[in-house]
């Protein structure tokens, strides 16, 4: 699904989630904390109960005809299409799945505009509505679908949390996503998976100061970013028009830490399924030094004890300069120089791509070899791609650019 197919301009969407939250994973890396997980690797599939509400404007798009129950079933069927797409990514990258609560129909509205509880404010009102209709203890994550041009998770890392005040910024049921055409990947991946990613503990990854609002330690993708927690297509300088359907290393790190050891680990054992699938291994290799203005290759390795088909994702792990809006340049001494890309079956990644190297180039628009001395930090994430209950592994390494050689 292409964002260009939406009826509103591309830049009408803004994620307003506040970033003033400190998760333990943000201050620890390379497994320096023995209780921290950087990966989806504990052989558990976690199921979270989703209370999914909607405004009448959203409901009217999908209600169709029939009885009240039939119309609500039609609306929830569209919600299920969105969540099937979202769950597919969450299960593969995070071993998380979400299911509708039994009483979800009581959160679905359609009919006269203004007949629902929302009147322009969606976060606090969503929490109030869900709690009043189904009860605080009956769900783990609450969200609202509407047709406004924005999204706001209402919190970061609050899923399954104990805070009962919807106005607190820590309530589990205050997420919302709105688009005039709430269908397809432009809605499901770019926006719903993004906002729910915040609710589970993920921060923004885009580094452009035009839309920078992350943790200060997670803005590791140039420009708008291109993975789920970025702003692809809606923030200059744009890497591409739409988000790719995966979470980057920093988001897997933070969300995994939260659901295994943080607030979002607070679910009963009956919602955690143990499985036999073992995590893969990842080896990013040793740190090394290269001359300035020199193309290079990242060579990794991985294996899977169960023989699953593994994929590899090399990503730069350098938070960006707060003052930068442009694509990376060769003289940039801090921040990301290389964009994130979807995983491949090759353990190696050429920087920039081999096709460019063969022409003598050392850069593309979003992949630039530095001409100054600096460090480039990289992560290698290995996925085993099991349909439900996928596991990941990661390893970190550093390339030091010698500013006097080359």
Regions found by a protein language model. Give the residues of each.
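The catalytic-center signature of Zn2+-dependent metalloproteases
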Residues: 101-123, 164-245, 319-324
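Proline-centered linker/hinge motifs at extracellular inter-domain junctions
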Residues: 276-283, 310, 380, 405-406
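Exoplasmic/lumenal beta-rich domain surfaces
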Residues: 99, 311-372
């Amino acid at each position: 699904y292409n964002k260009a197919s939406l009826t509103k301009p591309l830049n009408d969407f803004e994620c307003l989630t506040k970033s003033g939250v400190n998760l333990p994973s943000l201050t620890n890396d390379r497994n320096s904390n023995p209780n921290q997980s950087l990966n989806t690797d504990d052989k558990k599939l976690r199921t979270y109960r989703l209370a999914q509400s909607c405004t009448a404007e959203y409901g009217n798009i999908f209600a169709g005809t029939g009885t009240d129950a039939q119309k609500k079933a039609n609306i929830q069927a569209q919600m299920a299409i969105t969540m099937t797409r979202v769950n597919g990514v969450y299960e593969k990258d995070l071993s998380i799945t979400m299911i509708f609560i039994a009483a979800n129909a009581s959160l679905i509205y359609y009919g006269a505009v203004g007949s629902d509880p929302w009147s322009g404010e969606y976060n606090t009102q969503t929490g109030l509505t869900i709690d009043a209709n189904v009860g605080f203890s009956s769900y783990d994550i609450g969200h609202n679908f509407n047709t406004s041009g924005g999204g706001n998770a209402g919190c970061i890392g609050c899923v399954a949390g104990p805070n009962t005040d919807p106005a607190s910024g820590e309530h589990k049921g205050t997420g919302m996503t709105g688009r005039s055409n709430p269908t397809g990947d432009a809605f499901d991946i770019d926006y719903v998976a993004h906002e729910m990613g915040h609710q589970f503990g993920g921060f923004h990854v885009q580094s452009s100061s035009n839309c920078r609002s992350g943790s200060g330690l997670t803005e590791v993708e140039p420009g708008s970013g291109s993975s789920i927690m970025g702003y692809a297509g809606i923030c200059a300088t744009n890497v591409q028009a739409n988000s790719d359907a995966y979470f980057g290393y920093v988001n897997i790190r933070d969300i995994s830490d939260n659901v295994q050891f943080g607030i979002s680990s607070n679910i009963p054992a009956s919602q955690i399924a143990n499985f036999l699938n073992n995590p893969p291994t990842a080896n990013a290799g040793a740190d090394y030094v290269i001359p300035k203005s020199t193309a290079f290759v990242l060579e990794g390795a991985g294996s899977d004890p169960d023989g699953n088909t593994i994929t590899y994702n090399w990503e730069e792990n350098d938070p960006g300069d707060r003052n930068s809006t442009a694509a990376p340049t060769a003289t940039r001494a801090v921040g990301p120089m290389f964009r994130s890309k979807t995983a491949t079956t090759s353990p190696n990644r050429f920087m920039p791509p081999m096709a460019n190297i063969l022409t003598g180039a050392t850069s593309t628009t979003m992949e630039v070899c530095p001409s100054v001395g600096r460090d480039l930090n990289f992560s290698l994430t290995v996925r085993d791609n099991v349909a439900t209950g996928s596991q990941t592994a990661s390893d970190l390494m550093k390339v030091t650019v010698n500013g006097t050689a080359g």
